């Protein structure tokens, strides 16, 4: 098991069922050292208000030896790469994930989807693109992976895509992993948990990575320090409370 999980939702996204405290308790049981709460951005119908994200600054950094990153799974809004995260939200958040979600950006043709994703990557506002292997959104995988490597943005392999959602993602995700490997980029693993019980589960992700001989040294979840080094390379100030994770 890797000790870092970068994608999960709480009851603040009302189609999810666990609290921050639930995730902390589960992290202690499973040996997770660092995790990110990434509730849906406010343009989603059941997402929290933008004040929710601004007020995450009151969260403790570490509880019972478990580090907590303040994050969001923002929505890509248009071909210009705009996302539903702005202003004071950026000041409170450590980790910005962004991806396509049908209620905000409906599936388009391959060229349009690719343009929107690359513009989001190039914006400098995001750290990870969520579930880029979603078969509903055809993209130029090679072009996206090369843009992500250039701009130091990780592409996610999402465990939920192989279990509960985005049916038919396997082939696309293998292609994404292979393209990231060839481009020398980063992969992030996300459980995409909507209940704490699936936190840290990456078994299906690892099957995808193994199938393409993906290099472990390019997986962000291998250690808290690797993930923090990545975020600091993107401009995040070092967080003193995480020094001993």
From Swiss-Prot:
CDD domains xref list: PHP_HisPPase_Ycdx_like
Cofactor note as given: Binds 3 Zn(2+) ions per subunit.
The keyword Flavoprotein is assigned to this record: no
A Pfam family hit: PHP
Cofactor(s) the protein needs: Zn(2+)
GO MF terms, alphabetically ordered: phosphatase activity; zinc ion binding
Keyword vocabulary terms for this entry: Hydrolase, Metal-binding, Zinc
A Gene Ontology term for the protein's cellular component: cytosol
Top-rank taxon: Bacteria
Binding of Zn(2+) 3, residues: 73, 101, 131
GO BP terms, alphabetized: bacterial-type flagellum-dependent swarming motility
Positions of Zn(2+) 1 binding: 7, 9, 73, 192
Positions of disulphide bridges: none
Subunit structure: Homotrimer.
NCBIfam families, per the entry: PRK09248.1 (NF006702)
Protein name according to UniProt: Probable phosphatase YcdX
């Amino acid at each position: 098991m890797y000790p870092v999980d970068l994608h999960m939702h709480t009851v603040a996204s009302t189609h999810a069922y666990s609290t921050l405290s639930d995730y902390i308790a589960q992290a202690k049981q499973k040996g997770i050292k660092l995790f990110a709460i990434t509730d849906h951005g406010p343009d989603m119908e059941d997402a929290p208000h933008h004040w929710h994200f601004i007020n995450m600054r009151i969260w403790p950094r570490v509880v019972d030896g478990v580090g907590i990153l303040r994050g969001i799974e923002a929505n890509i809004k248009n071909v210009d790469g705009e996302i539903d995260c702005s202003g004071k939200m950026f000041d409170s958040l450590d980790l910005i994930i962004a991806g396509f979600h049908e209620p905000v950006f409906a599936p388009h043709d391959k060229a349009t989807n690719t343009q929107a994703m690359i513009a989001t990557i190039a914006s400098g506002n995001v750290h990870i693109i969520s579930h880029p292997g979603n078969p509903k959104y055809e993209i130029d995988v090679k072009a996206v992976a090369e843009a992500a490597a250039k701009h130091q943005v990780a592409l996610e392999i999402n465990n939920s895509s192989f279990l509960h959602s985005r049916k038919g993602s396997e082939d696309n995700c293998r292609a994404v992993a292979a393209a990231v490997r060839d481009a020398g980029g980063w992969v992030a693993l996300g459980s995409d948990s909507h209940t704490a019980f699936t936190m840290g589960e990456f078994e299906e992700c690892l099957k995808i990575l193994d199938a393409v001989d993906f290099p472990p040294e390019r997986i962000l979840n291998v250690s808290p320090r690797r993930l923090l080094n990545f975020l600091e390379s993107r401009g995040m100030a070092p967080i003193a409370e995480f020094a001993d994770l």
